Amino acid sequence: MKREDVLMEALPYIQKFHGRSMVIKLGGHAMVDTCIMDTVIRDVVLLQLVGIKCVIVHGGGPEITEKMKAMGKQPRFVSGLRITDDDTLEVAQMVLVGKINSKIVSLVSRAGGRAVGISGNDANLIIARKMDRQKVRVENREEEVDLGHVGEIEEIRPALLHTLLDNQFIPVISPLAIDRNGNDLNINADTAAGELAIALGAHKLISMTDVDGIMNRERTEVYRRMTPQDAEELIASGVVSEGMIPKVLAVLRALHGGVPYAHIINGNLAHNLIMELFTAEGVGTMITDRIDEV
């Protein structure tokens, strides 16, 4: 496709999305590859420059695990959730806020944008409660495990985000929360992104991962568009499995909460974010029950 054709195809999408908000969840290999991350951030800054209000939510699980191992501490998980004792919470805060968040903010500035790095516990942005003990099977018997400082989101207070967005800043949010007694909690980044999208009334939730989207059973083709019901059936039938399940569930929660469109795309390929949003074919999976709009 010629360069002028790309620009002309993008124009109606730019016009349609102008002034609308989008929550972009960054995860996967892009989080540890600065070159890939730099490309993604440049795309986000471009979105802002054409009038789209962007919120970035980032993960950091692999980096937390790496830091813990370097400190001689073995990570532990139950049902995909990290057991977060006092030391683990301290490491998570160090990695998420001190390393990843600050790096993203710097990349936004380098690309010509303006970002503000915050955590979910800043300004009581994300209120959560300590997650209930989880039941697991150990040697043919059921046990309950305390996950420690792991939170389940109860409330989003988006006033700070609206202020930042209205003043042309890009909020960059670490997946931490605070309970009603002022205690810090670790939360799932996919879940946080979905709940923030609902609270903001976002037009789109975009999950950037290490895969091209939701694949068919044979793993030979990416579904370009599907309804929430289609996605639920793929989970029930086992086509969507393992690490994709929590990502798709977070997307479905956002859609059921009023977000019109959700996308799952590969964040490791240059300019996939732009191609997904500004071309008719896209590059990943769009989930929506809308028919005509984008």
UniProtKB/Swiss-Prot annotation:
UniProt entry tagged with the keyword Cytoplasm: yes
GO biological process: arginine biosynthetic process via ornithine; L-arginine biosynthetic process
Record site feature (Transition state stabilizer), residues: 25, 247
Gene3D superfamilies, A to Z: Acetylglutamate kinase-like (3.40.1160.10)
Entry GO CC: cytoplasm
ATP-binding among keywords: yes
SUPFAM superfamilies the record matches: Carbamate kinase-like (SSF53633)
Annotated function: Catalyzes the ATP-dependent phosphorylation of N-acetyl-L-glutamate.
Designated name of the protein: Acetylglutamate kinase
Organism: Methanospirillum hungatei JF-1 (strain ATCC 27890 / DSM 864 / NBRC 100397 / JF-1)
GN (gene name): argB
